[in-house]
Curated annotation (Swiss-Prot):
GO biological process, one term: monoatomic ion transmembrane transport
Glycosylation sites: 41, 205, 229, 239, 258, 269
Domain of life: Viruses
Keywords: Cleavage on pair of basic residues, Disulfide bond, Glycoprotein, Ion channel, Ion transport, Secreted, Signal, Transport, Viral ion channel
InterPro entries per record: GPC_FiloV (IPR014625), GPC_filovir-type_extra_dom (IPR002561)
GO molecular function: channel activity
Protein name from the UniProt record: Pre-small/secreted glycoprotein
Organism from which the protein derives: Reston ebolavirus (strain Reston-89) (REBOV)
């Protein structure tokens, strides 16, 4: 045992030399910020990428591209009963609308027409220029009633409702939307030698019908007590045949359910309403919840901070900032151009004028 122990034990002098070498490597790494391990040309740390993009490459806000990102990528439940629980009514909060340049193709979109018990509408009509989200695989069209305890329907998690290149904080009546957020991509300025070859331009067939390139399937629902704690959702197969939805499900499951009822002659054969209930043994999660389910584990949704904060400096937060909501119409007219609708909020980004001086690029804000 003793000799075996001596074999495993590092001699005192060698231990001192080894520990000294380790400390030298650690201090050396911290001093010059070189990652431990084999350093090659492909070794690039996240902080270096951040500095490369943010410090050296952003010379003009023309390099910023605003994009709409769907919440489906975070793995949220997309069935109607689950989705409607993320929306709620509030009063006294003005709606905000911002534009974005590009977006994703959505797997699930929604279209709501909800009335109060007295027959009045719960949701406002969309402002001029607001059109439905153009790329949806499934459109969940919901009609029904609810208490609607408030003037406008907002997202409880602070997300946007994405329409056609416009994102709003509220839901508009009869207008297809996807849930999402608006983010900025920073595009590096292209070098001149990138454009030596003539770029290939593919012919684009422009059309006013933005949904003509993509197969969209509309699924209809009927909902009662929309916006309440206990809402009831029915999947509409035809005008007289419905299915009670009592647990989360995928749109692919509803498509199969619709085909099964029709193929087996399970539709209502009278003018009365026939409502089916799901067998508890049936698995309603056929297909996919969303096309990027692996992002479910991402924490802190809507709280991501990027280097864009270095360039976009909002107005300092003061107690008077709330008073901006009560500004008179005359003051608002000086804030926005006359051609800008009152519901459209421009994103206040600073433009830069850049020039080369002594071989260095120098930028200053445009006046």
């Amino acid at each position: 045992m003793g000799s075996g122990y001596q074999l495993l034990q590092l001699p005192r002098e060698r231990f001192r030399k080894t520990s000294f070498l380790v400390w030298v490597i650690i201090l050396f790494q911290r001093a010059i910020s070189m990652p431990l391990g084999i350093v090659t040309n492909s070794t690039l740390k996240a902080t270096e990428i951040d500095q490369l993009v943010c410090r050296d490459k952003l010379s003009s806000t023309s390099q910023l591209k605003s994009v709409g990102l769907n919440l489906e990528g975070n793995g949220i439940a997309t069935d109607v009963p689950s989705a409607t629980k993320r929306w709620g009514f509030r009063s006294g909060v003005p709606p905000k609308v911002v534009s974005y340049e590009a977006g994703e193709w959505a797997e699930n979109c929604y279209n709501l027409e909800i009335k109060k018990s007295d027959g009045s509408e719960c949701l406002p009509l969309p402002p001029d220029g607001v059109r439905g989200f153009p790329r949806c695989r499934y459109v969940h069209k919901v009609q029904g009633t609810g208490p609607c305890p408030g003037d406008l329907a907002f997202h409880k998690n602070g997300a946007f409702f994405l329409y056609d290149r416009l994102a709003s904080t509220v839901i508009y009546r009869g207008t297809t939307f996807a849930e999402g957020v608006v983010a900025f991509l920073i595009l590096s300025e292209p070098k001149k030698h990138f454009w030596k070859a003539t770029p290939a331009h593919e012919p684009v067939n422009t059309t006013d019908d933005s949904t003509s390139y993509y197969m969209t399937l509309t699924l209809s629902y009927e909902m009662s007590n929309f916006g309440g704690n206990e809402s009831n959702t029915l999947f509409k197969v035809d005008n007289h045949t419905y299915v009670q939805l009592d647990r989360p499900h995928t749109p692919q499951f509803l498509v199969q359910l619709n085909e099964t009822l029709r193929r087996n002659n399970r539709l209502s054969n009278s003018t009365g309403r026939l409502t089916w209930t799901l067998d508890p043994k049936i698995e309603p999660d056929v297909g996919e919840w969303a096309f990027w389910e692996t992002k479910k584990t991402f924490p802190n949704n809507f709280m991501e901070k990027t280097c864009i904060s270095k360039f976009y400096q909002p107005t300092p937060t003061t107690p008077q900032i709330r008073a901006r909501r009560e500004l008179s119409k005359e003051k608002l007219a000086t804030t926005h151009p006359p051609t800008t609708p009152s519901w459209f909020q421009r994103i206040p980004l600073q433009w830069f004028q850049c020039s080369l001086q002594d071989g260095q690029r120098k930028c200053r804000p445009k006046v």
